[in-house]
């Protein structure tokens, strides 16, 4: 056991999906994994391990934001030997050509979080996805005919921000805003692991367009399938 994960050694696979919502983890396990078994209920942050097309895969809720995902990623890697981590979550678009329900593969992540500034003593670090995971996920998306976008996302420390300045980030090509990817990529690099964020555009920050519950469910499935295929095809 680690501090926040109650799994025994060997109960967590080397390849894992990371939704923020623990109920989304439960949905993924019940819908996509065979023989899924719950290994964690600590703090209600559910975790499961099963198989996908014969490959052993885990799924673990992480909560929201940089501090929360950092706790789980640290423990998954250091205490349980996880090697491949794929975030599956939502984001808000800030580009006019990025549409609600599109799937974004986060090639890199800008951030206003101070975590990396503390680690690198005030200098800027560029959190970046694993190329092989990114390429595989892109190929899967093309095979499925999905509306994929690949590029930089912005990891925000605040969900409610009175002065977000999205226009500046959009002008520099940032596709969307979320709250975890920069931390995931930084920690994966630190521990020589592979990481990728596969994100569904659930709303458009500039236009105000949103998805319905039914539309979210369908699009989330596309995102989850891309992530599962990327994890299983990179199972070396």
From Swiss-Prot:
GO terms for cellular component: cytosol. The active site is at residue 203. The record marks 216 as: Important for catalytic activity. Phosphate binds at residues 20, 24, 43, 87-90. GO terms for molecular function: purine-nucleoside phosphorylase activity. It holds the Pfam family PNP_UDP_1. GO terms for biological process: purine nucleoside catabolic process. Signal peptide: none annotated. It catalyses: a purine D-ribonucleoside + phosphate = a purine nucleobase + alpha-D-ribose 1-phosphate; a purine 2'-deoxy-D-ribonucleoside + phosphate = a purine nucleobase + 2-deoxy-alpha-D-ribose 1-phosphate. Its EC number is 2.4.2.1. Keywords: Glycosyltransferase, Transferase. It comes from the Bacteria. InterPro entries: DeoD-type, Nucleoside_phosphorylase_CS, Nucleoside_phosphorylase_d, Nucleoside_phosphorylase_sf. A purine D-ribonucleoside binds at residues 4, 178-180, 202-203. Homohexamer; trimer of homodimers. PANTHER family: FI09636P-RELATED, URIDINE PHOSPHORYLASE. Catalyzes the reversible phosphorolytic breakdown of the N-glycosidic bond in the beta-(deoxy)ribonucleoside molecules, with the formation of the corresponding free purine bases and pentose-1-phosphate. Belongs to the PNP/UDP phosphorylase family. NCBIfam families: deoD, PRK05819.1, PRK13374.1. This is Purine nucleoside phosphorylase DeoD-type. It comes from Geobacillus thermodenitrificans (strain NG80-2).
């Amino acid at each position: 056991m680690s501090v926040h994960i109650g799994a025994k050694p060997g109960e967590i696979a080397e390849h894992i999906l990371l939704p923020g919502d623990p109920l989304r983890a439960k949905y993924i396990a019940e819908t996509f994994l065979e023989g899924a078994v719950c290994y964690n209920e600590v703090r209600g942050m559910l975790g499961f391990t099963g198989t996908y097309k014969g490959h052993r895969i885990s799924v673990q809720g992480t909560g929201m934001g940089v501090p929360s995902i950092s706790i789980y990623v640290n423990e998954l890697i250091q205490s349980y030997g996880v090697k491949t981590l794929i975030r599956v979550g939502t984001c808000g678009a800030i580009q006019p050509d990025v549409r609600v329900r599109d799937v974004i593969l986060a090639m890199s992540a800008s951030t206003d979080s101070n975590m990396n500034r503390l680690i690198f003593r005030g200098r800027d670090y560029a959190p970046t996805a694993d190329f092989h995971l990114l390429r595989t996920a892109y190929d899967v998306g093309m095979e499925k005919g999905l509306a994929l976008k690949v590029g930089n996302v912005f990891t925000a420390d605040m969900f409610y921000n009175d002065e977000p300045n999205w226009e500046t980030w959009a002008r520099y090509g940032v596709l969307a805003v979320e709250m975890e990817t920069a931390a995931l990529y930084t920690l994966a690099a630190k521990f020589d692991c592979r990481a990728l964020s596969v994100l569904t555009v659930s709303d458009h920050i500039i236009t105000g367009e949103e998805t319905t519950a039914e539309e979210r469910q369908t699009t989330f499935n596309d995102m989850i399938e891309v992530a599962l295929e990327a994890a299983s095809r990179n199972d070396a």
